[in-house]
Amino acid sequence: MTLLTQSSTWQALSAHSKNVPHMRELFATDAARFNKMSLSACGLLLDYSKNRATAETLDLLFTLASNSQLEAKIKAMFAGEIINTTEKRAVLHTALRSTAEQSIIAEGQDIVPEVQQTLNKMQGFVSSVTSGQWKGYTGKAITDIVSIGIGGSFLGPKIVSQALRPYWNPELKCHFVANVDGTSISEKLKLLDPETTLFIMSSKSFGTQETLTNTLTAREWFLAKGGLQSDVAKHFVAVTSNVAKATDFGIDADNIFPMWDWVGGRYSLWSAIGLPIALLIGMDNFRALLSGAHQMDEHFANAPLTENMPVIMGLLSLWYGNFFNAQSHVVLTYDHYLRGLPAYFQQLDMESNGKSVTLNGTDVDYSTGPVIWGGEGTNGQHAYHQLLHQGTALIPADFIMPLQSHNPIGEHHDQLASNCFGQTQALMQGRTFDEALAELANSALPAAEKQLIAKHKVMPGNKPSNTLLMDKLTPSTLGALIALYEHRTFVQGAIWDINSFDQWGVELGKDLGNDVLTRIGASQDCDALDASSNALINLYRHGKI
């Protein structure tokens, strides 16, 4: 057993998990439960009253957090200590949304001035493009942005841009390319005019395979459509640490934006990686996005554990994963603009906490990161909600909804909200056999069939959920929401004593993929690998099954 699972608090939580009353009973015996188990911060309200939790549960979870030195670990992250120990890096995505008055030291120097300088450079660039001052090679203004990246440099900008669609500049469109599948970029290029298209290439090394391949294809398309190599600088910019490679490609050094080692890819949308967002919504709104995240940073850093929104959410998720064997967690967004958030939170959580050894290399003997999945309401109610209500697996849920819609048409939003709240109520209370049978009382069915149908209509309830509300989806509330989930992820990793900021699981597949690519291009069939890999490679080489 690890020190964590040997601890008296862990053992107490394990025993306590078997004795928590059904949520029906918890609500029936405490009319003030919502008031006691809800919290507002940074423009968000968290209702966590529909959880399998009592005051004793929360006390034990907060004790577990304290005994795991959570507060010290939070301070260490914000102070720029090397908490990504396997890569020997600080973790300072929070510095990207700091104020100009702050001082944050990394590697012996204050990084805030460089962050502010980059924001100011972004401001000038955005102004140049959106005003029409930036011209393409034929003198036309830019109408289309193509953002080329992978992982965090793709998903963050795409999902945030999608979420903030009401704030877009109507003169610009943005297209996101990540997958190395040629179909992805080909379908995008079919829509574009090379004279009015600007490509943003985002890669720390300027050598990420998928991103470089797509960028080279974009340049070939641009040149084939009439552009010259000398025109590349008017249509390509880069976010990278490798200035030399970018300038060799043809990008003007003045149009290269920096990346830093102390920012991980899945936390990078707040940096110049967010340039596509800034172009679409403007720098004032981009700064509001940063401000919302900064407010959540301040809350996370300073609120006591018992009143700390990311801490509470992280602890409750850990509670179900480690003591109720919950293997997945569903995120349900009751706002069409937020439909991409489950995929973003999936990457954030699963790449961060999909680990199986502690910081000192000990194998864990407890579950770590769950599968994160989800979708938008009300679509999911006609699909996977059936599993949530009557399936055998316990799947905690987060419901996210703005109280006000950007598109208040008729009763649409009233119906959306009623479905959201109704789902959380149904998950909590369920339906007993007697209730189901009573609903069939006036049916003409025979008594035996009523009994049978009633059994099929039983829902156990006691299915946990959080509800997150905001007045309206704005850049600020979106920033706070994303930062909330970042810090929630950190809380779990800190208690599990794992490194939430590396991703070695990504590397092996990449390395083997490069080896396979060489074998695909060889002059002879492959016979050097395992039988399955040999067969698959050779089938691909011959182009048919």
Curated annotation (Swiss-Prot):
Entries under InterPro entries matching the protein: G6P_Isomerase (IPR001672), G6P_Isomerase_C (IPR023096), Phosphoglucose_isomerase_CS (IPR018189), SIS_dom_sf (IPR046348), SIS_PGI_1 (IPR035476), SIS_PGI_2 (IPR035482)
Gene3D superfamilies per UniProt: 1.10.1390.10, Glucose-6-phosphate isomerase like protein, domain 1
Function description: Catalyzes the reversible isomerization of glucose-6-phosphate to fructose-6-phosphate.
Uppermost EC category: isomerase
Organism: Shewanella baltica (strain OS195)
One of the record's GO molecular function terms: glucose-6-phosphate isomerase activity
Pfam families: PGI
Active site: 351 (proton donor), 382, 510
EC number(s) reported in the record: 5.3.1.9
PROSITE patterns: P_GLUCOSE_ISOMERASE_1 (PS00765), P_GLUCOSE_ISOMERASE_2 (PS00174), P_GLUCOSE_ISOMERASE_3 (PS51463)
Reaction(s) the record says it catalyses: alpha-D-glucose 6-phosphate = beta-D-fructose 6-phosphate
Protein family per UniProt: Belongs to the GPI family.
Gene name for this UniProt entry: pgi
Name by which UniProt lists this protein: Glucose-6-phosphate isomerase
Keyword check for Isomerase: yes
Cell compartments where the protein resides: Cytoplasm
GO biological process, one term: glucose 6-phosphate metabolic process
Pathway(s) annotated for this protein in UniProt: Carbohydrate biosynthesis; gluconeogenesis; Carbohydrate degradation; glycolysis; D-glyceraldehyde 3-phosphate and glycerone phosphate from D-glucose: step 2/4
GO cellular component: cytosol
Keywords: Cytoplasm, Gluconeogenesis, Glycolysis, Isomerase
